Amino acid sequence: MQITDIKIRKIITEGRLRAIISITIDNMLAIHDIKVVQGDERLFVAMPSRKDENGIFRDVVHPISLEARAAVEGEILEAYKNHLYNLEIENGEAVV
């Protein structure tokens, strides 16, 4: 499995939500509405989810293994940080 494209759809500067991301896997599968969230200790990736009939949020799609989760999260966070860095260079100021 290879992430072949990462699109930063939206950057958010207020609250804990930092970005909305879409990824493409193997040029065959797109996953939208992945969130970059500022946690208490670090940034993390939240996979797309829906609220079930009991009001509990359940992931719609997610990596199965810890290794796959770490790989997906690592690539997404790297792309997010690179995007912020490029915005800072373009604008001459910090974005977040």
Where are these regions (language model features)?
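Single-stranded nucleic acid-binding surfaces, predominantly the OB-fold ssDNA-binding core
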Residues: 1-96
